[in-house]
Amino acid sequence: MRVAGIIVEYNPFHNGHLYHLQKTREITNADIVVGVMSGNFIQRGEPAIVNKWARTKMAILNGVDVIFELPFAYACNSAEIFAYGAISILNQLGVDFIVFGSECGDIDKLKETAKHLAFEEDDFKSSLKSYLKEGYSFPKARELALIKTCKTNIEFSSNNILGIEYIKWIYRLNSKIEPFTIRRIGASYNDPNLTQDTYASATAIRRNINNLHAIKNKMPSVSYEILLEEFESGRGPVILEDYFKLFIYNAIVVPDFLKNKIDVKEGLENRFEKYIFNSPSAKNLLENVKTKRYTLTRLQRIFIHAIVRNNFDQKALLSITPYVRVLGFNYKGKEYLNKIKDKIEYITKLNQQWLKNPQYKELLELEIRSSMLHALQYKDFHKYLQTEFKSSPIYISSRS
């Protein structure tokens, strides 16, 4: 059985994602495609516009055979930690291939750059340290160090960076996964504008989420219908601004609310304190706090980690093995799960037994807490606060 893995967020599932899925099957000739998907919060430090169960349903109905969860601690984090979590899960599953989108579309260039990161040499480390001292953000400092010491000419754009991180962790974990990349088509990852093209970025779709007619042709019909159902049921769209008052509340009642929180360094908490009580919105606050080193995306993650009360040791995340949890599957996925169940332990129904497992306890507690915070924004929020314990994987039995 040939198994291909993809790493996704599906926020929401759009035409570009369908193209990626189709090309994955075409390139690898895979019998099964499994996805590792972010839960209720995504890598950019934002809540997913609809919950992970709705997005899992989109994925399965559009042809992904199994969706596994990328735990919150990894999903809402830097590219390095995000990639480690996802590759670690795919490696546990023993997939044969990974296929990801990139701006360059050249796997050899990405591999070469990833090798320099996987096996850091002294001149690279020295250059990185120097650029960090100059006040650059870590991603920018690393980019400059690579250009200087490795003579790489690759563009350090969003998907290229993630692709490099995926390959880096394949090398570091001594994984047998074979990586492939496809060139992104249509709008760039961060393009906020809708065009006549049927391929739009997820960013553009989210920005125009209140104009459902405008985004209808940018998504497969089944994705659009699920999105509409979630909105009509009061379970979305969930956005970062929904949490601004909660953030302020914490700043009021918790002394030194941000001190010693994840990624809060060099007196960053003082910049937050300077602006927090004079800012009309989360967007305004974060724009004011932003510096050359602290990018908007990084600040959004700090914002989310603070309200979720995430104190997980970030270095430890790169040395532990994340749990494997099934969110949904189809009839082919069911056969695959039955085939691997004797080789790997995976979660289908979350219960107290899993929470007592010291290996996964903290990761699962964070997942539960983040999901409850997501549910707080729903119309009938009280019905969904215990969803993590009530939900079983979504099963789509149709063979059509």
UniProtKB/Swiss-Prot annotation:
Enzyme class: ligase
InterPro entries named among the record's database cross-references: Rossmann-like_a/b/a_fold (IPR014729), tRNA(Met)_cyd_acetate_ligase (IPR008513)
Localization per record: Cytoplasm
SUPFAM superfamilies: Nucleotidylyl transferase (SSF52374)
Binding sites annotated in the UniProt record for ATP: 7-20, 101, 159, 184-185
UniProt catalytic activity: cytidine(34) in elongator tRNA(Met) + acetate + ATP = N(4)-acetylcytidine(34) in elongator tRNA(Met) + AMP + diphosphate
A GO term from the CC aspect: cytoplasm
Keyword tRNA processing assigned: yes
EC number: 6.3.4.-
GO molecular function, one term: tRNA binding
Keyword presence, Nucleotide-binding: yes
Secretion signal span: none
Gene3D superfamilies tied to this protein: HUPs
Swiss-Prot/TrEMBL GO biological process terms: tRNA modification
Pfam families registered for this protein in UniProt: HIGH_NTase1
Entries under PANTHER family matching the protein: TRNA(MET) CYTIDINE ACETATE LIGASE
Protein role: Catalyzes the formation of N(4)-acetylcytidine (ac(4)C) at the wobble position of elongator tRNA(Met), using acetate and ATP as substrates. First activates an acetate ion to form acetyladenylate (Ac-AMP) and then transfers the acetyl group to tRNA to form ac(4)C34.
Protein family: Belongs to the TmcAL family.
Listed name of the protein: tRNA(Met) cytidine acetate ligase
